[in-house]
Amino acid sequence: TDLPSLSEVMTVVEPLGLVVTDIEILRLHYAETLRQWRERFMKNRDEAVKIYDERFCRMWELYFVICELGFRHQNLMVFQLQLAKNLDAVPLTRDYMIDWERRRAVEEGAKRQYAA
């Protein structure tokens, strides 16, 4: 099956009465993710062959390469939608996301400090 385009997703979302409050287009992010997954897989390939088999490993190598090439060169992309029931459900800018990430980083740092 094909990955749905943004317009195809929107035709399903719109009749639900949901409002799109944010869209993020992650252009080459998934290609990079697939590349890194493939590198990690290859570093552990011998172990994977022992657990599964050679056919399994070849299948995953092929999957990682084909998918990475598709996302890198064939205009495939991942997009994230933020949907809400109300237009004013989230702030007007993404600043609240940054503030949340900062608070989370501080909390994680404190947890590590006290765990040591």
What are these regions (language model features)?
Residues 92:
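Hydrophobic positions on the alpha-helical face of helix-turn-helix-like DNA-binding modules
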Residues 95-116:
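Short, cationic low-complexity segments
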Residues 1-89:
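Substrate-binding/catalytic lobe of Class I Rossmann-like enzymes that use SAM or dcSAM, i.e.
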